[in-house]
């Protein structure tokens, strides 16, 4: 699933882990 908005991606940048992960490592 996608991490909540504003949540840390824990270093993962792949969309399979975080639907809208930006380059700063946070979901948007």
From Swiss-Prot:
Keywords: Calcium channel impairing toxin, Ion channel impairing toxin, Neurotoxin, Presynaptic neurotoxin, Secreted, Toxin, Voltage-gated calcium channel impairing toxin. InterPro entries: Omega-agatoxin_II/III_CS, Toxin_34. It is found in: Secreted. GO terms for molecular function: calcium channel regulator activity; toxin activity. Its main location: secreted. Pfam families: Toxin_34. This is Omega-agatoxin-Aa2a. GO terms for cellular component: extracellular region; host cell presynaptic membrane. Belongs to the neurotoxin 04 (omega-agtx) family. 03 (type II/III omega-agtx) subfamily. It comes from Agelenopsis aperta. Omega-agatoxin are antagonist of voltage-gated calcium channels. They block insect neuromuscular transmission presynaptically. Potent blocker of N-type calcium channels (Cav2.2/CACNA1B). Expressed by the venom gland. It comes from the Eukaryota.
């Amino acid at each position: 699933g996608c991490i909540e908005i504003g949540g840390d991606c824990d270093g993962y940048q792949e969309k399979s882990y975080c639907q809208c992960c930006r380059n700063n490592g946070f979901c948007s």
